[in-house]
C-alpha cells in the first residue's frame, strides 16, 4: 500500500511507519524496484514514530497495535481535515474504529465490507470458500472535543 500511495502522490510525499523489520526490508527493496523516491520509511510504532512527521493530508492505517484512538487523535491534531482510511478484519478492530468514528464526530464517514472467495477442488466440483471479509473505514473532518 505504501508504494502505491507514493506513486499516486506524484510530486507529494508519503511516509510509511512499520514496527517489524520483516516488513520494512521488502518495502525498501520495492522502493528501489519501482523507483519510488518520495517515500520515507520510519521504523517504530505509531503514534510515537509519527510525532515528528509533517501534517498529513491523507493517512492509511493498516494496523494499530492497539493504538488506534491515539493514532487518530495525533493525525487530527496535525490536520483536523486529514482523510483517514483504515482496514480491519478482527471484530476488536472493527469495534475500535466504530468507536473512533463516534468519539471524533467525523463529518464524513463510510464503511465498506469486501468479501473474497477462493475455489477449491472437491471431486468433480469447484466450490467457492469464503475468506475473511475486510472492512474499509474512511473518515474525514474529525473533532478532538
Task: Locate each region found by the language model.
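Cytosolic regulatory regions of ion transport systems
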Residues: 38, 67-68, 91
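Conserved SAM-binding loop of SAM-dependent methyltransferases across substrates and taxa
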Residues: 1-11
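Active-site-adjacent beta-strand anchor residues
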Residues: 17, 61, 87-88
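C-terminal substrate-binding/active-site "lid" region of AdoMet-derived donor-dependent transferases
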Residues: 73-130
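S-adenosyl-L-methionine
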Residues: 15-56
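Core SAM-dependent methyltransferase catalytic element
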Residues: 123-145
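Short beta-strand element of Class I
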Residues: 11-16, 84
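Short SAM/SAH-binding signature in class I
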Residues: 54-63, 83
